[in-house]
């Protein structure tokens, strides 16, 4: 099983609509680790680590977002896995 790490940035109407909690639930459902946080520019940033197939599914779910969000763009940069052990919501930056 190949582990991957994806650093993602979601743009659109994604703050104030529970997007971070949506991301947290998707990561838990797919048994992935990492973090998510709001950025002061209105985007949502995060990192997810796990098996490649599950990470791809997670990113697809982020592109769809919850019903009340409006996702305009998801940028993804793959990095070397760093051994994240949980998935958490971080403070905004």
From Swiss-Prot:
Keywords: Hydrolase. It catalyses: an acyl phosphate + H2O = a carboxylate + phosphate + H(+). Its EC number is 3.6.1.7. It is an enzyme of class 3 (hydrolase). Residues 5-91 form the Acylphosphatase-like domain. GO terms for molecular function: acylphosphatase activity. This is Acylphosphatase. It comes from Moorella thermoacetica (strain ATCC 39073 / JCM 9320). The lineage of its organism: Bacteria, Bacillati, Bacillota, Clostridia, Moorellales. The gene is acyP.
